[in-house]
Amino acid sequence: MRDLELDIISPETIHSGRATDAYFERTDATLAHADRTPQVVAEVTADQFPTGEFALLADHAVDVDAIPPGRCFDGGPVMRISGPYRDFARLETALLGLLSHASGITTAARRVREAAPDSPVLSFGARHVHPSIAAVVERSALVAGLDGFSHVAAGDQIDRAASGTMPHALLLCFGRGEQEAAWQAFDAAVGDDTQRIALCDTFSDEVDESLRAADALGD
């Protein structure tokens, strides 16, 4: 039965083990048919999926050891799962997907952080992913050491206010020659807790618009 809004697989489906590769279902069926329940130690290695995500395994009779989120590493297993294989076999696909996606984002964000160690760096990556996983993107950016993120609903999810600048759309709505009016309207409209960051490249080059913004807004 297919009832997916926006092609989103529900958390309940993921926890149930249905969000898996077909061969894991067939493996489970084969082991059940053969009446085999092997005790195993599964390792997640560094060339696959670094970091830890335990909630998916919380209701299963397994022991999990892993390095904490945000820990830098250089080779070796980063997670071990010990227990009856059939208890978590169907969860492998979802588990590795959770770890791989988040750690890939964190690694990329960390490279930016290291390239600009003394500058404020914000994540605007949510516009490039499915909206249902925006909180994954923004949390991963924070784990990497970025200073903030742009996505409002993600902020609700992880209990941290979103931040950002202003979009080109705002300047375009005011029109060419009205950049000062747009910057001043933004300054007047937003709260005192919002940073004033004027976007200075919509109609003219950055130098020209930066000078105009400084003149229009002052200190």
Residue ranges and their predicted role:
Residues M1-D192:
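Ordered alpha/beta subdomains of enzyme catalytic regions
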